Design a protein with these regions (language model features):
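Internal intein/HINT superfamily modules and their associated LAGLIDADG
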Residues: 1-235
């Protein structure tokens, strides 16, 4: 679609897509110009200035896209990169001697999206505005939460567990599908979501099914389905 080449980073379990020919670069810039919502737009617009000056183009410089997140697939792409679909399955544990509950049983679905606080020291390089917009997308009226991975890494986090709020996400991702392997996790996560909505997660069969689904999600996944890539034909 855009050309370029792939570089495999085996140690990091990652693939890097590199676009470096002039034609491919200009094509990519033209397609995504006006669609950016994060502080990365600063470097992107610097690239446009360089292209315009170097090659006498007249590529327009746009500000951050502030349209509704429901209006396009940008959030879907952001989730593909950094979102997480989680299933919590905690079995009830009881002391056989005292009959005291040691651990309460709990089953829930959760969505989490984390992003570093900023990409520089300038206030315009903060991720807070876009993360707050995503936070508001789910109907939250409170301020953003922070998540610390260690002493020097602090992130903004949007975390959702309410079934009603998660339904907003499901509707959105049905309209703007995920395109990476994360689509597989989303579909399995939706199965657990529906079991909870239907109160089937409380039955022995439901618990067993959820346990099996969870065992093949995210980093534990061994079975992949790529049928969803058909959506690329609509791009």
């Amino acid at each position: 679609m855009f050309g370029g080449r792939l570089r495999f980073k085996n140690k990091e379990n990652a693939i890097v897509w590199i676009v470096n020919t002039h034609k491919e670069l200009v094509n990519l810039v033209t397609v995504i110009n006006g669609c950016l919502r994060t502080p990365k737009i600063i470097k992107f617009n610097d690239l446009i200035v360089w292209l315009n000056n170097k090659y006498h183009y007249n590529i327009p410089i746009n500000s951050v896209d502030t349209s509704s997140l429901n209006s396009n697939g940008w959030l879907s792409g952001f989730i593909d990169a950094d979102g997480g679909f989680k299933v919590r399955y905690t079995e009830k544990r009881v002391d056989v001697k005292t009959n005291k509950v040691l651990t309460k049983g709990r089953i829930e679905v959760r969505f989490a999206l984390e992003q570093r606080k900023n990409i520089g020291t300038n206030i315009n390089e903060s991720y807070k505005p876009i993360m707050f917009q995503i936070h508001s997308f789910f109907g939250f009226l409170t301020d953003l939460r922070e998540s610390k991975h260690n002493a020097d890494q602090t992130y903004w986090i949007v975390e959702v567990s309410s079934l009603n709020r998660l339904n907003l996400l499901i509707q959105y991702l049905n309209n703007y599908p995920l395109l990476t392997a994360k689509r597989n996790d989303f579909e399995d996560w939706c199965k657990v979501y529906q079991l909870i909505v239907d109160n089937k997660h409380l039955s022995d069969d439901g618990k067993l099914l959820i346990k099996n689904i969870k065992s093949n999600m995210n980093k534990k996944r061994e079975i992949f389905n790529w049928n969803h890539l058909i959506y690329l034909n609509k791009v």
